[in-house]
C-alpha cells in the first residue's frame, strides 16, 4: 500500500491471483516431475523464478509488480512438489523423517528470510528485490550442481498408468480426503497471520510482542522435535493417528486463544499450535508419497501442495468475513468447527484406504 499507492483490496486481489498461480504451478510441477523427472522440473521452475525476480528489479511499479509476483508464484509453485517428490525418491524408506527434514529446512528459511528481509528493507525497499534475485541465483547454483542425480525411482510412461483401476481409484479418493483436511487446517492456521494478528493490535499488544510469537514458533519447531518423538512411537508411526492428534491440538490452541486478552495467553496458544503443526505438516506429504501409484509421485505431491495453497488463499478472506460480520469469538468457534470437520475427513481417509500408510 505504501510503496505502490494501491488499496488493501487491490493488494488482497493480487495475493489471491498469486495464490492461483501457485496452485497451477503446484499441479503442473507435480505432473512434469512424473514426465520429465525432478531435475528438469526444478530447473524450469527456477528459470521462471529468475526471470520474474530479474524483471521485478527493473519494473516494480504498478501493474508490473503484480504481474511478476504472479509469475514468481507460478515458478515457485512448480519447484515445491518436485522437491518433495525428489526427496521421496532419494530416501524412499525415510517415511515421515524425509518430509520432516524438508519441513525443518523450510522453517529455517522462513525465519532467516523474515529477519534478513527486515534488515534489508531498513536501507531501501528496492533492495528486497535484489536480495530475492540473489537468493534464486544461489538456489539455481545448488540445483544445477546438486540436483542432477540418478534417482532410483520407478517412473512409468503416462499411458501405462491405469488410473481407472480399482486400487488407484481408492488411492486417489484417499488422497483427496487428505487434501480436504489439509486445506481446512491451513484455513485455520493462517488466522494466526491475519485475523488474530489484527486482534492482538486492537487490544494493545505491540507488533514486537506479536513477532515474538512467531519467533517462539520457529525455535520450537527446531528444538522441540524430541518432545513429540515419544508420542509418535506410542502411535507406532501411524500417520492417520498423527494427523488426528495434530488436529485435536490445533482445536485446543484455538479454544485457549479464544479467551486471550493478554500476551501470555496468546503465547500459550502459539506453543500449543506449534505442537499441532509438528504432527500434521510432515505427515501429509509422507502420506502422499505412500499413496501415490508408481509414476504419479509428483502429481500426488502437487495435489497436497495445491491444497495448502488454496487453504492459505481462502483463510484470510473467510476469517475476515466472519470477524467483520460477527466477532472474534465466533471466528474462534468457526475454526474449531472446521477443524472438527477436518477430523471427519481423516476418519473417512482411514475408511477409504489407509492400508498403504498405516505405519511409518
Give, region by region, the residue ranges found by the protein language model.
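Helix-to-loop junctions at the C-terminal end of transmembrane segments
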Residues: 25-37, 224-237
Amino acid at each position: 500500500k505504501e510503496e505502490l499507492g494501491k488499496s488493501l483490496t487491490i493488494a488482497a486481489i493480487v495475493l489471491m491471483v498469486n495464490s492461483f498461480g501457485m496452485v497451477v504451478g503446484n499441479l503442473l510441477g507435480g505432473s512434469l516431475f512424473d514426465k520429465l523427472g525432478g531435475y528438469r522440473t526444478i530447473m524450469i521452475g527456477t528459470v521462471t523464478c529468475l526471470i520474474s525476480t530479474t524483471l521485478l528489479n527493473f519494473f516494480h511499479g504498478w501493474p508490473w509488480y503484480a504481474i511478476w509476483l504472479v509469475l514468481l508464484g507460478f515458478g515457485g509453485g512448480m519447484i515445491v512438489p518436485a522437491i518433495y517428490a525428489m526427496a521421496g525418491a532419494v530416501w524412499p524408506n525415510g517415511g515421515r523423517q524425509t518430509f520432516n527434514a524438508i519441513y525443518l529446512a523450510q522453517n529455517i528459511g522462513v525465519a532467516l528470510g523474515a529477519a534478513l528481509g527486515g534488515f534489508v528493507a531498513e536501507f531501501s525497499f528496492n533492495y528486497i528485490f535484489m536480495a530475492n534475485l540473489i537468493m534464486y541465483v544461489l538456489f539455481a547454483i545448488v540445483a544445477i550442481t546438486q540436483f542432477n542425480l540418478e534417482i532410483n525411482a520407478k517412473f512409468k510412461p503416462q499411458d501405462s498408468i491405469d488410473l481407472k483401476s480399482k486400487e488407484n481409484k481408492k488411492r486417489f479418493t484417499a488422497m483427496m480426503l487428505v487434501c480436504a483436511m489439509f486445506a481446512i487446517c491451513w484455513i485455520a492456521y493462517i488466522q494466526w497471520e491475519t485475523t488474530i494478528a489484527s486482534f492482538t493490535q486492537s487490544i494493545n499488544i505491540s507488533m514486537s510482542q506479536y513477532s515474538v510469537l512467531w519467533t517462539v514458533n520457529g525455535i520450537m519447531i527446531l528444538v522441540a522435535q524430541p518432545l513429540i518423538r515419544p508420542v509418535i512411537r506410542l502411535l507406532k508411526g501411524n500417520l492417520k493417528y498423527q494427523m488426528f492428534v495434530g488436529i485435536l491440538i490445533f482445536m485446543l490452541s484455538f479454544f485457549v486463544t479464544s479467551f486471550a486478552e493478554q500476551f501470555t495467553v496468546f503465547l500459550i496458544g502459539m506453543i500449543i499450535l506449534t505442537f499441532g503443526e509438528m504432527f500434521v505438516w510432515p505427515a501429509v506429504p509422507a502420506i502422499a508419497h505412500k499413496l501415490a501409484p508408481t509414476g504419479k509421485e509428483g502429481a500426488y505431491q502437487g495435489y497436497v501442495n495445491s491444497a495448502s495453497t488454496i487453504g492459505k488463499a481462502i483463510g484470510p478472506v473467510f476469517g475476515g468475513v466472519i470477524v467483520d460480520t460477527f466477532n472474534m469469538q465466533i471466528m474462534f468457534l468457526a475454526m474449531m468447527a472446521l477443524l472438527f470437520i477436518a477430523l471427519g475427513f481423516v476418519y473417512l481417509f482411514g475408511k477409504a484406504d489407509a492400508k498403504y500408510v498405516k505405519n511409518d
